[in-house]
Amino acid sequence: MPEKPLRIVLVGAGALLGKALNEELSVSAFAAADLHLVDDEAALGKLTAAGDEATFIQQIEPDSFDGCDFTFFAGSRELTRTHWHQAFRAGSRIVDLSGELEGEPGVPLRAPWVQDNPAAAPDLQTRAVVSAHPVALLLALLVTHGGQTAMMKALWATLLQPASEYGHEALEELHRQTANLLSFQPLPTDVFRGQSAFTLAVSFGGESPVQPAGSAGVISGQYAEVAPAGSPSLALQVIQAPVFHGYALSVAVELSRPLAANALGRALAGPHVHIVADADAFPGNVRAVEEEDMQVLVRPVFEDAGSAASRETRRFWLWIVADNLKLAAQNAIACAAELDRLRPRGGVQ
């Protein structure tokens, strides 16, 4: 008798991250699942797609999680806080993309592409996991690929963070600010609490929900947790950029021994990482949106005439762009696949 399809509930289906996750699920190993899209009242009734079928986003009801195998929380932290116990009590396995469950007892932080320590892996008792921040995953993935060839000693990174990290409202406000500045109109500041268009900012003040320094703390902490043992230290600053989508990172790398740029590129290349050899062909963050892999440009920093002559150096600049929403969705699906391998199958004989 064929196994019945998995039942999946996507909470926060109307959010930007929820939409990206819905799209990625439709082309993943979970494509045949019975997918239910739910959200709070603000997103009710919106027409969207679940796989190849049109559907409406439904309201979260007391029985929304009954018989559910997996629940993805892709909306706000508040939405997760309100409903995750309901999903847990219903017996669903949970993947949290909002970060609300980080630190909860028995809820590990996961980045399956880079975490290979069996002691840290989910077990049969694991019912919920937090999907790691995409930038923590991205940096840990580069370190993992580099391995013994690159032997990285330290990373210094600057992240240019897009408005889409903060949802529809932030995108709309950035758009309106851009238009209003060009027409000399007052700026809406409900989300950012200050000007975000045509400027780079490290802070919008304590009243703003947009806190680049807070993002830096989350990413640094999660990188330390998911990166392999012995990984290089990370110094990170986050700058809010006047862009809609896509991460861009400038990363300075120091190695333990000199390498040529092409040798480092070969070491870093691998699953989910595409090395772009020519700067003229390197995509910006706009073109990186919808790319399956992060795009990486490797540039040597020659310390002296000797290293320039040998074309080998211990210091490099990496310029990296990636689709922030797609990367987050892909990691969440990898988390679910990890939990699915532990799911009991069949009946008692």
Segments (PLM) and residue ranges:
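N-terminal Rossmann-like NAD(P) cofactor-binding subdomain of oxidoreductases
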Residues: M1-G194, S231-S233, G284-E290, V296-L297, ...
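Charged docking surfaces used in two-component/phosphorelay signaling
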Residues: T71, A163-Q349
